Swiss-Prot record:
It comes from Gallus gallus. The lineage of its organism: Eukaryota, Metazoa, Chordata, Craniata, Vertebrata. Belongs to the bZIP family. Maf subfamily. PROSITE patterns: BZIP. Residues 226-251 are annotated as: Basic motif. GO terms for molecular function: DNA-binding transcription factor activity, RNA polymerase II-specific; RNA polymerase II cis-regulatory region sequence-specific DNA binding. This is Transcription factor MafB. One of its GO terms (cellular component) is nucleus. The gene is MAFB. Expressed in brain, thymus, gut, lung, mesenterium, spleen, kidney, ovary and bursa.
C-alpha cells in the first residue's frame, strides 16, 4: 500500500466531497500498535510487533505476521476511522488477498462515507464475537474489524469447509437416534415362533433359495437355520409324496395293462376252443366222406362206365 493515493474516476465528483478528501494527506498517518494484552486474549504470543512508522503491504516475518496488530478503538482520537481503514485493508489482504482486494481508492471511498463507519463497527463487533465463539476449536482466530457482512461474503470457502466438517462428524444425539432406530428395527422383527409361521408351507417349497435369503435378512442365525431345516423337510416330504404318487400311478397303469392282457388271453383261449371244435367237426365229416366213398367204389367196380374199365 506504499505510494501516493490517487483518486480514480469512480470517486464522487461533487465539489464538497473532493474538497473534503483533498484536505487529508493519508500517508502522514501511522498505524497504531496493538497492546500485548489484546494479543494474549486472542491466543497469540508475539515477540516482535510491527514498527510504528511503517505502512507497508509486505507482512513482517514474525510468528503473528498473518494477523497484524489492530488499532485501538478510542472515540476521542480524530484519526480512528482512517487508521481502521488502513489496518483493515492491510490485515485482510495478508490473510486472504483474494477475498477482499482493498486499494487506496477503496479506502478513500470508504472515508467519504465515514459517518456510517461507527454503525458498521458496532454491527461487526457483535458478528466477530459470535464468529469467535463458533470457531473456538480452530487453530487460529480471524478478526476483521470495520468489515461488514457483505465484505465477508467472498470468504465463504473456509466456513463452507467448516460446515462440511460438522456434517461429517455425527453428534451424540444423531448417533443415539440411529441406535434407537436400529433397536426399533430389531424389535419390529417377529419372535422365533412367528418366523416359521410367517411363510406358509407352499411358499417355502415354491420359493427359490435367493428369494428366501432376501426375506430372511435381519433375523438371527438360529431362526434362519430352523426355517431352512423346515423348508428342507417340506421339500423331502414333497419329493417322497411325489415319488409315492408316481409309484401308485405306475401300479395302476400296470394293473390296467394286466387286466387287459388277461382279457385278451381269455379271448384267445375262447378262440382256440372254437377253432378246436371246428377242427373236430371237419375231421368227423372228412372221415364220413372217406367211408362213404370206399363203399361206393366197391359196388360199382364191374360197371364199364368207370374209368378203370376203359383202361
Amino acid at each position: 500500500m506504499a505510494g501516493e493515493l490517487s483518486i480514480g474516476a469512480e470517486l464522487p465528483t461533487s465539489p464538497l466531497a473532493m474538497e473534503y478528501v483533498n484536505d487529508f494527506d493519508l500517508m502522514k498517518f501511522d498505524v497504531k500498535k496493538e497492546p500485548l494484552g489484546r494479543n494474549d486474549r486472542s491466543g497469540r504470543h508475539c515477540t516482535r510487533l510491527q514498527p510504528a512508522g511503517s505502512v507497508s503491504s509486505t507482512p513482517i516475518s514474525t510468528p503473528c505476521s498473518s494477523v497484524p496488530s489492530s488499532p485501538s478503538f478510542s472515540p476521542t482520537e480524530q484519526k480512528t476511522h482512517l487508521e481502521d481503514l488502513y489496518w483493515m485493508a492491510n490485515s485482510y489482504q495478508q490473510m486472504n488477498p483474494e477475498a477482499l482486494n482493498l486499494t487506496p481508492e477503496d479506502a478513500v471511498e470508504a472515508l467519504i462515507g465515514s459517518h456510517q463507519v461507527s454503525q458498521q463497527l458496532q454491527g461487526f463487533e457483535s458478528f466477530r464475537a459470535h464468529h469467535h465463539h463458533h470457531h473456538h476449536h480452530h487453530q487460529h482466530h480471524h478478526q476483521y474489524p470495520a468489515v461488514t457482512h457483505e465484505d465477508l461474503a467472498g470468504s465463504g470457502h473456509p466456513h463452507h469447509h467448516h460446515h462440511h466438517h460438522h456434517q461429517a462428524s455425527p453428534t451424540p444425539s444423531t448417533s443415539s437416534s440411529s441406535s434407537q432406530q436400529l433397536q426399533t428395527s430389531h424389535q419390529q422383527h417377529p419372535p422365533s415362533s412367528s418366523v416359521e409361521d410367517r411363510f406358509s408351507d407352499d411358499q417355502l417349497v415354491s420359493m427359490s433359495v435367493r428369494e428366501l435369503n432376501r426375506h430372511l435378512r435381519g433375523f438371527t442365525k438360529d431362526e434362519v437355520i430352523r426355517l431352512k431345516q423346515k423348508r428342507r423337510t417340506l421339500k423331502n416330504r414333497g419329493y417322497a409324496q411325489s415319488c409315492r404318487y408316481k409309484r401308485v400311478q405306475q401300479k395302476h397303469h400296470l394293473e390296467n395293462e394286466k387286466t387287459q392282457l388277461i382279457q385278451q388271453v381269455e379271448q384267445l383261449k375262447q378262440e382256440v376252443t372254437r377253432l378246436a371244435r371246428e377242427r373236430d367237426a371237419y375231421k368227423l365229416k372228412c372221415e364220413k366222406l372217406a367211408s362213404n366213398g370206399f363203399r361206393e367204389a366197391g359196388s360199382t367196380s364191374d360197371n364199364p362206365s368207370s374209368p378203370e374199365f376203359f383202361m
